[in-house]
Design a protein with these regions (language model features):
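Fungal secretory targeting signals
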Residues: 1-29
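Mature, structured extracellular domains of secreted fungal proteins
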Residues: 21-192
Length: 192
């Protein structure tokens, strides 16, 4: 049986018994930007490809750690992979949902006009983090794996929509993240 990424996020959060975590917004220290471009029908969503000098690694339980176990293998397609959702408490200071919708729509537009899949380089490389920003909303995908990953723009779009609507002030949060069950990657949504 096939589930959408949004269904998997709900299932993961529910099965983990997680409504919110004590985890704060995960910050990237000493970030070095390798490239910047704009996406979407109106080219109004800023995209940066970068690397964090101090990488914020997060476990599937939402805990920041200094290292993860190395996995072997080549580039892996992680489209549709389960992830665990964590919201940042307390409420206040989160992104505007409509700004996050612009990013989600830009991802869908590029999925239809550029391609459904994108690649992100291995952890420790100059482009292991992809960040998208529109007005008050920022989302990023961080590869925590030692191999390149392939992910779906439609899945990222669904997660942006989910996190912006579920991890908001009405739910006593100000953004959140979804960490892959195998800890290879996470996607975060936060205020710019």
């Amino acid at each position: 049986m096939k589930f959408s990424i949004a269904s998997l996020v709900v299932l993961a959060a529910t099965s983990a018994g997680v409504s919110a975590a004590a985890l704060g917004s995960v910050a990237c220290a000493n970030e070095v930007v390798a490239d910047t471009t704009y996406i979407g029908e109106n080219k109004d969503v800023k995209v940066t490809y970068s690397h964090c000098g101090v990488t914020p690694l997060v476990t599937a339980q939402g805990t920041e750690v200094s290292s993860l176990h190395k996995r072997q293998g080549n580039s892996t397609n992680v489209c549709g992979a389960q992830c665990n959702t964590f919201c940042f408490n307390p409420s206040g200071g989160g992104p505007n949902e409509s700004d996050c919708t612009v990013i989600a729509d830009a991802l869908l537009y590029d999925s239809q006009n550029v391609g459904a899949l994108f690649n992100i380089t291995a952890s420790g490389t100059s482009t292991d983090k992809i960040t998208m920003q529109y007005n008050s909303c920022t989302t990023y995908f961080l590869n925590q794996d030692f191999n390149n990953l392939t992910y779906c723009r439609t899945d990222w779009s669904a997660l942006v929509t989910w996190l912006a609507s579920d991890c908001n002030a009405a739910n006593n949060a100000h953004g959140g993240l979804c960490v892959a069950a195998d800890q290879r990657w996470y996607i975060q949504v936060q205020h710019t």
